[in-house]
Amino acid sequence: MEQILKFFWYSSTIILIFTILIHNPKSEGLGSVGAQNQFFSNTRSTENTLNKITWLFLVLFLLLTTIIAVS
């Protein structure tokens, strides 16, 4: 049972790291001068979906961490 939990824990860790890394930065800074405006509805819905996936895997990671630590 512990092997299965650790497999899901490692998988959720990798997916969580990946989803965090593919997020767009919130601040635009000087690098956006002259850049195109990216406030299309498609971009917003993709960002919202990515946020939900990130939170889901964060909760899963923390839950599995707690379960593995207790057992």
From Swiss-Prot:
GO molecular function: protein-transporting ATPase activity
Superkingdom assignment: Eukaryota
Keyword Transmembrane belongs to the record: yes
Keyword vocabulary terms for this entry: Chloroplast, Membrane, Plastid, Protein transport, Thylakoid, Translocation, Transmembrane, Transmembrane helix, Transport
Family matches, as InterPro entries: SecG
Biological process (GO), any one: protein secretion
Membrane topology per record: Multi-pass membrane protein
Main location, first listed in the record: plastid
GO cellular component: chloroplast thylakoid membrane
Chain ranges passing through the membrane: 4-24, 50-70
Record's subcellular location: Plastid, Chloroplast thylakoid membrane
Keyword Thylakoid: yes
Family: Belongs to the SecG family.
Role noted for this protein: Involved in protein export. Participates in an early event of protein translocation across the chloroplast thylakoid membrane (Potential).
Protein's name according to its UniProt entry: Probable protein-export membrane protein secG
